Amino acid sequence: MIVSIDVDAQKTFTPLCPDELPVNEGHLIVEELNAQAALADLRVMTKDAHHAAAKWLVDNPVDMLKPTGLPDADLTWVAHAMVGTRGYELLDGLPSAKEYDYSVWQGVDPELHPYGACFHEIEEKLRTGMIERMRCQNTDKVI
């Protein structure tokens, strides 16, 4: 089984949301993600989904990437991918969230800011189920 993963393909990481965490030309990856998915049996989506009361939030980008002292949200970040905002949305041209075979929403809890889709926190104790799902599907390749 081949699984294709669309990793955080959201407007927050593009010039479409310049006040969040824009990556130059980040919005131009859709064609490649769709081509990659055409080679797979299953398509997975990961998505940052942050809370307005997140304890790692700072207003000014100058204050980003500073230690928070929190065990599962180690650094400060400006608001990005806040649920319900434009930055939270998937890029245009991708399937809707309901059309993916499996989805992982990361960072929903205000005290958590994980950097991956397999665990909800930095200590890697709270599993998202992605690894287990891939094992159950007999995944032998991930793209």
Where are these regions (language model features)?
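Active-site acidic carboxylates
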Residues: 1-108, 116-117, 135-140
